[in-house]
Amino acid sequence: MRIEVIRREENLLEFYLEGEDHTFANLLTETLHENEHVTFAGYTIEHPITMARKPRFKVVTDGKITPEKALEEAAQKIFDRAREVLEAWKAAIE
């Protein structure tokens, strides 16, 4: 996974997330939508063949937090949820 910043402003961030596809892109977008300070979060895959594993994201906040902070919080939520799934799985197979 590699992040390439395209545009950065006070409450806007556009970037490519190289090495990922719709699976992680959807998860990240939906998690960003849970943040009350995120006014827009979305992604596109510009070409289904040549850019299939390089979604382009746009994150806009209300200015109370930065888009970078919103991404940090979303990444932590995803990590925490994955840990919960792992723990539930371990409990189920014991």
From Swiss-Prot:
Its EC number is 2.7.7.6. PROSITE patterns: RNA_POL_L_13KD. One of its GO terms (molecular function) is protein dimerization activity. It holds the Pfam family RNA_pol_L_2. GO terms for cellular component: cytoplasm; DNA-directed RNA polymerase complex. Disulfide bonds: none annotated. Keywords: Cytoplasm, DNA-directed RNA polymerase, Nucleotidyltransferase, Transcription, Transferase. InterPro entries: RBP11-like (IPR036603), RBP11-like_dimer (IPR009025), RNA_pol_Rpb11_13-16kDa_CS (IPR008193), Rpo11-like (IPR022905). It is found in: Cytoplasm. Signal peptide: none annotated. It catalyses: RNA(n) + a ribonucleoside 5'-triphosphate = RNA(n+1) + diphosphate. GO terms for biological process: DNA-templated transcription. Part of the RNA polymerase complex. Belongs to the archaeal Rpo11/eukaryotic RPB11/RPC19 RNA polymerase subunit family. PANTHER family: DNA-DIRECTED RNA POLYMERASE I,II,III, DNA-DIRECTED RNA POLYMERASES I AND III SUBUNIT RPAC2. DNA-dependent RNA polymerase (RNAP) catalyzes the transcription of DNA into RNA using the four ribonucleoside triphosphates as substrates. This is DNA-directed RNA polymerase subunit Rpo11. The lineage of its organism: Archaea, Methanobacteriati, Methanobacteriota, Thermococci, Thermococcales.
